[in-house]
Amino acid sequence: MTPIKVVVHGASGKMGQEVLKTLCQENNFHPVGAVDIRAESPAMALPDGSGSIPYSADLSSILSQTKPDVMVDFTVAKASMPAIRIAAAHKVNLVIGTTGFSPEEISEIEQLAKTNDIGIILAPNFALGAIIMVHLAQVASRFLSSAEVIELHHDKKLDSPSGTALVTVASMLEARGEAFNKPPKENLTDARGQEHDGIRVHSVRLPGLLAHQEVIFGAAGQTLTIRHDAFSRECYMPGVLLAIKEIVHTKGFVFGLDKLLKL
């Protein structure tokens, strides 16, 4: 199998570095370029010490120079949207792990995939355990009508609620087919989190955390808690590799890693 050539956008960030390290360990993937707004030199040393790859803040230049099969994006929505447009114009498939997009931006990303005849996967979470957590929450939502979501992340995460929390809530509501039980009236506005059709969502941002979420269901005499904890960014890499592998054979827009797992 010819290795899949990959450019990483947001390469100097923590997720970008983890992606590059993982790609270097795999025979079927080949990192060929790195892009980051903080780039100050024309080359970036690979994490495994095997050499260096072209490095620039100019995405279009890197894509023209390296001719990748896939661009992996882990940045912020404000930086990601212009990069997605550029990559799509270059006919480069995309794996997007950035969150915080508006519904209008997601619609634009879907249209870019169609217009440019490329594959784009946008996934709020690449941890396989987190995907299974959402799936189990969907199952429970068919039977239990009171639920709350608590998501906890590191203090550098900009968006709240997290993309995973929003996807979890949407999936639960879809599975249930109606609103959950409305919680009692609160005396202090937003003291019990943000309400989504009866589901309260609570966001915690603290140093020392990475990415954690629990979905708590309650019924008379019982509770059910479904929880996922990410302690290291390594947990996202199997999902990222799966997305890269599949997107080169996929046309159009895919939202969520669960579609590739066929859950």
UniProtKB/Swiss-Prot annotation:
Residues reported in the UniProt entry to bind (S)-2,3,4,5-tetrahydrodipicolinate: 154, 163-164
Alphabetic keyword roster: Amino-acid biosynthesis, Cytoplasm, Diaminopimelate biosynthesis, Lysine biosynthesis, NAD, NADP, Oxidoreductase
Binding site for NADP(+): 38
Catalytic activities: (S)-2,3,4,5-tetrahydrodipicolinate + NAD(+) + H2O = (2S,4S)-4-hydroxy-2,3,4,5-tetrahydrodipicolinate + NADH + H(+); (S)-2,3,4,5-tetrahydrodipicolinate + NADP(+) + H2O = (2S,4S)-4-hydroxy-2,3,4,5-tetrahydrodipicolinate + NADPH + H(+)
Chief location category: cytoplasm
Pathway: Amino-acid biosynthesis; L-lysine biosynthesis via DAP pathway; (S)-tetrahydrodipicolinate from L-aspartate: step 4/4
HAMAP family (UniProt xref): DapB (MF_00102)
Entry protein name: 4-hydroxy-tetrahydrodipicolinate reductase
Organism: Dehalococcoides mccartyi (strain CBDB1)
EC number(s) reported in the record: 1.17.1.8
Family assignment from sequence similarity: Belongs to the DapB family.
Function noted in UniProt: Catalyzes the conversion of 4-hydroxy-tetrahydrodipicolinate (HTPA) to tetrahydrodipicolinate.
Subcellular location: Cytoplasm
CDD domains the record matches: DHDPR_N
Gene Ontology molecular function, alphabetical: 4-hydroxy-tetrahydrodipicolinate reductase; NAD binding; NADP binding; oxidoreductase activity, acting on CH or CH2 groups, NAD or NADP as acceptor
GO biological process assignments: diaminopimelate biosynthetic process; lysine biosynthetic process via diaminopimelate
Annotated active site: 153 (proton donor/acceptor), 157 (proton donor)
Superkingdom of this protein's organism: Bacteria
Gene3D superfamilies in the cross-refs: Dihydrodipicolinate Reductase, domain 2 (3.30.360.10), NAD(P)-binding Rossmann-like Domain (3.40.50.720)
